[in-house]
Amino acid sequence: MAAETASGYIQHHLQNLTYGQLPDGSWGFAHSAAEAKAMGFWAFHVDTLGWSLAMGLLFIWLFRMAAKRATTGVPGGLQNFVEVLVQFVDSSVKDTFHGRNPLIAPLALTIFAWVFLMNSIDLVPVDWIPQIAMAISGDEHLFFRAVPTTDPNATLAMSLSVFALIIIYSIKVKGLGGFLGELTLHPFSSKNIVLQIILIPVNFLLEFVTLIAKPFSLALRLFGNMYAGELVFILIAVMFGAGLLWLSGIAVVLQWAWALIHIFIITLQAFIFMMLTIVYLSMAHEDNH
């Protein structure tokens, strides 16, 4: 790796491949964290975009292949897996979502599978994908992060998409008046009109904070858990690079132990993101507060 010290190695692994406008006015890839920061809002994390798109296409390809090979006879391994996953998601939706909307189950399945696939990249040894990217580009200083869900931009983008659906269905089901009523007439209400008017700003503040917290809690929960998991793998890799045989032996044990734990974590985080999405959309379909 281009970074020789432990701190440099860690920082290198935590920096995205960023494309944007350089200080001289030209457009290109950032070669330092300072350059990436200077690019401002219109900077693109190419690695995050590429891998999230790749995992989305992988999800579509796997499920399309399973659908094409589906048979009424003895199902194959992929068909069995897809059927179990679909039944699991369908059962979760039926138990949690109390409205009627044909979009919810496919959306929940897409979220779970896509987030799981993006999370699962974290199980690949931390140096493999960056080293391949460096070899292909010919740039030994290339920044490259392969796990999209360790980038808050990716998790926030997904959660904001869910948030948009919450707003759309809240207005569609309850009407604009009903939606605004939820924000201004609850949780405090009074039969006295003057007092109710006085309570409107208080209600709006409380309900607006609750509403706006939903996408941020979704995004930060997924990002925080995956970022921490990635950091643990990087720290274990630093132990390998220390050059001490006994430390490398401990690192081997820790790597396998953490990988086994992390399989549970990446699955759990995909499940939580899916379930919270279902819960929030179910609340958006409820007529009463």
Swiss-Prot record:
Q: Where in the cell is it found?
A: Cell inner membrane
User: What Gene Ontology molecular-function terms does this entry list?
Assistant: proton-transporting ATP synthase activity, rotational mechanism
Q: Which GO terms describe its biological process?
A: proton motive force-driven plasma membrane ATP synthesis
A Pfam family annotated for this chain is ATP-synt_A
Superkingdom of origin organism:
Bacteria
The record's PROSITE patterns line, in alphabetical order, gives: ATPASE_A
Claim: Transport is one of the keywords in the record: yes
Just give the chief location class.
membrane
Q: State the function annotated in the UniProt record.
A: Key component of the proton channel; it plays a direct role in the translocation of protons across the membrane.
Q: Which family does it belong to?
A: Belongs to the ATPase A chain family.
> Which HAMAP family does the annotation name?
ATP_synth_a_bact (MF_01393)
Protein name stated in the entry: ATP synthase subunit a
User: Which source organism?
Assistant: Pseudomonas entomophila (strain L48)
